[in-house]
Amino acid sequence: MWVLFLATFCGLGASLTAVDNLGQIGESLGYPNKTVTSFVSLVSIWNFFGRVFSGFVSETLIVKYKVPRPLMMTLVLLLACIGYVLVAFPMPGSLYVASIIIGFSFGAQLPLIFAIISELFGLKYYSTLFNCGQLASPLGSYIFNVKLTGFLYDREAMKDLAKKGLTRSSVKALTCIGSHCYRLPFIILTFVTFFGALTSLILVVRTRNYYRSDIYKKFRENAESL
């Protein structure tokens, strides 16, 4: 469970951080407000597609090819890394692609996490383990969003103020304009998510024999006993 918790902490924590900051990222890169709204809409739309896709595809791979579901989690986290790199090193229009990737990978993680919990640990303590898995999400978001991204963004904004000869007391809110504002935070998020992918890969190795067996046998037996 701790391996899955760590992968969830890294994956969902980084994804929530990216989603929460997407509007401000667009502002920093000079996109108009209407375009920034489009980025948020793209995240929401592809979040839905990610949930449907990961559930359907991972189930098909298990039934037909006995592929461990955690492998799908690994691939989703690696995909998320691409989205973060596009934010850290933006090109013209690249934030559109980043929004799609971030939204898709964020949505894809959720069904996988809770399906993996039920398959590996059963339903007896599912509610407890479910909430433990849920805890990793806000915990990761707080650390990566508030303590990391927010701190580094404010630091870059203060540097911009110093270049203009201004002080913190002379402005109402800190605003950073330029690609440098989110570069370091998203480089760190990329490495954190990659570490989460490696962690989930450990789970793939440890569960490959289990997924080669009839994993739904115990669920059928429980249903028949009712």
Predicted regions and their residues:
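Paired intracellular helix-loop junctions of major facilitator superfamily
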Residues: 30-33, 90-92, 116-127, 157
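Interfacial helix-cap and linker-helix signal at transmembrane-aqueous boundaries
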Residues: 26-27, 57-62, 118, 148-158, ...
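Structural signature of the two symmetry-related core transmembrane helices
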Residues: 68-85
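A late C-terminal transmembrane helix in Major Facilitator Superfamily
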Residues: 42, 47, 51-52, 120-161
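Helix-loop junctions at membrane interfaces in 12-TM secondary transporters
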Residues: 88-98
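Helical-face signature of the major facilitator-like transporter fold
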Residues: 7-12, 44, 84, 98-103, ...
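Intracellular terminal tails of multi-pass secondary transporters
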Residues: 132, 136, 149-226
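Extracytoplasmic gate region of multi-pass secondary transporters
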Residues: 1-56, 110, 114-117, 141-149
